[in-house]
Amino acid sequence: MARSLKKGPFVDGHLMTKIEKLNETDKKQVVKTWSRRSTIFPQFIGHTIAVYDGRKHVPVFISEDMVGHKLGEFAPTRTYKGHASDDKKTRR
């Protein structure tokens, strides 16, 4: 179910304050966050946000196309290593 329009998009307060401070000083540095649930706002464009995937922080450079999506969409948590191969040919 989608979020109610009357509530508006969600972003963690600590993340928003960090980005606003960087925008005031015109600095571009990596911001570490564990908040995968935060929505990407237009203020984030041009910044690199390191999103935690459960093991490490994945650097995500924010572009215009990402606005409105969640940070967690760009840091996958699971690695797919493929299905087990069919060893019938090697058993002969």
UniProtKB/Swiss-Prot annotation:
GO cellular component: a single term: cytoplasm
Keywords: Ribonucleoprotein, Ribosomal protein, RNA-binding, rRNA-binding
A matching Pfam family: Ribosomal_S19
Protein's UniProt keywords contain Ribosomal protein: yes
Coiled-coil region: none
GO biological process: ribosomal small subunit assembly; translation
An annotated Gene Ontology molecular function: rRNA binding
InterPro entries: Ribosomal_uS19, Ribosomal_uS19_bac-type, Ribosomal_uS19_CS, Ribosomal_uS19_SF
Superkingdom of the organism of origin: Bacteria
PROSITE patterns in the record: RIBOSOMAL_S19
Quaternary structure annotation from Swiss-Prot or TrEMBL: Part of the 30S ribosomal subunit.
UniProt function note: Protein S19 forms a complex with S13 that binds strongly to the 16S ribosomal RNA.
Record HAMAP family: Ribosomal_uS19
Family, similarity comment: Belongs to the universal ribosomal protein uS19 family.
Record-given protein name: Small ribosomal subunit protein uS19
Gene for this chain: rpsS
